[in-house]
Swiss-Prot record:
It comes from Synechococcus elongatus (strain ATCC 33912 / PCC 7942 / FACHB-805) (Anacystis nidulans R2). The active site is at D294 (proton donor). Its EC number is 1.3.7.7. SUPFAM superfamilies: Helical backbone' metal receptor (SSF53807). Its cofactor is [4Fe-4S] cluster. This is Light-independent protochlorophyllide reductase subunit B. Keywords: 4Fe-4S, ATP-binding, Chlorophyll biosynthesis, Iron, Iron-sulfur, Metal-binding, Nucleotide-binding, Oxidoreductase, Photosynthesis.
Amino acid sequence: MKLAYWMYAGPAHIGTLRISSSFRNVHAIMHAPLGDDYFNVMRSMLERERNFTPVTTSVVDRNVLARGSQEKVIDNILRKDTEERPDLIVLTPTCTSSILQEDLQNFVERAKESAQCDVLLADVNHYRVNELQAADRTLEQIVRFYLDRAQRQGTLPSQRTEQPSVNILGMTTLGFHNRHDTTELQRLMADLGITVNAVIPAGASVEELQHLPRAWFNLVPYREVGLLTAQYLQDTFDQPMVAIAPMGITATADCIRQIQQVLNQQGAAVDFEPFIDRQTRFASEAAWFSHSIDCQNLTGKRAVVFGDNTHAAAFTKILSREMGIHVVLAGTYCKHDADWFEAEVAGYCDRVLISDDHNAIADAIAELEPAAIFGTQMERHVGKRLNIPCGVIAAPVHIQNFPVGYRPFVGYEGANQIVDLVYNSFTLGMEDHLLEIFGGHDTKEVLTKTVSAGSDLDWKPDGLTELNRIPGFVRGKVKRNTEKYAREQGLTAITAEVLYAAKEALGA
């Protein structure tokens, strides 16, 4: 456990709550002190939910610390069972309440004796896993619980569907553009003539889980959530999985080809090559854009990519092989799956950074000075301080990345959206230069800031005057180089002469 200004992946209980609240008619009881109960507000705000978030906090207070939690937790479970009539109640502690080392499994067994619904304790180690790992584990636990019971009761369907069908796994609440991606994947499957058997967990009921084995294959669009469930279904019911994220023209085609292979291995005779060709050459604007003069203007520009495994790896490959952009750094905060990420981006970037320390990423960006950043909300903040444009491509994100309009990131429409995001993220040098020359509605004195909140150097008026004469698109670099030179020389004030000397020293 550590105190952090910024966390890329939240604590484990957030992952469990994301899964439980994604299901329909499932309630969660969170055994936690006040302060850990921010999930309800966060979900209601970001997802703009019309309904109350189905999470209740069983508050750990001084009475609980004195008498123990059993009576209070069981009472809360039974009360919610009576009030909400859920199909399932999931009990989860937080990393804080786990310190009490209480036997919550015993509480669950006691509650089962009186509850009308099923009751589960989330099987997650809150000290060892983060939000994404906990979400993946909780989804697999719930699916396994209901399928194992259906097997014991003999109620599992014994045959696959007549026509090719798919389970889409890992679509959750608070996921990055998950709602739009779900719609786009359903459209893509319909275009391929594949029936969507289930979308788990978003909007699904636990009663639907027993029908999962009927699908011909499982699609896992995000590596972070759904992989454990797909592995369980593959091992137990011999259901193949497709785990290629269909982001970008090339990866979408690769995903469709793997789906074709999986279906044909099971007796179908499908050929999706004409569909891929038609979408790539005529329907999608992304492929056309990659041959345009606009895309050629981006060739060789330097970019930094950072995010979760799925989005960071996908964007690194899109920028490099589809747009000709030079990725100087590709990174992820998913340290638990670093080997996969390094293998995926090998050959597409100069350097790989595996870290969940936002300062390490910020320092790398400041050092590399790319033309654009593609990262999370934190990299967006870093970009603002350094005057480097940033496109947000992965969680964690703020409200503006839960758009009301339709903005998927997967499939062919997602490829179009990615093109817009990438192109609009780069600042064209002439644009800033013309604003400097002719002015505009929002002209103001702009000085690029460093990563640090403050500076120990004093810019004198004549130094600032000279700095403002430098075109905006290189001004930030000149300012940072001048400050670096001043520190090396032991100077505390920067005048015009110091700026000239710095330029001379750098050979500019």
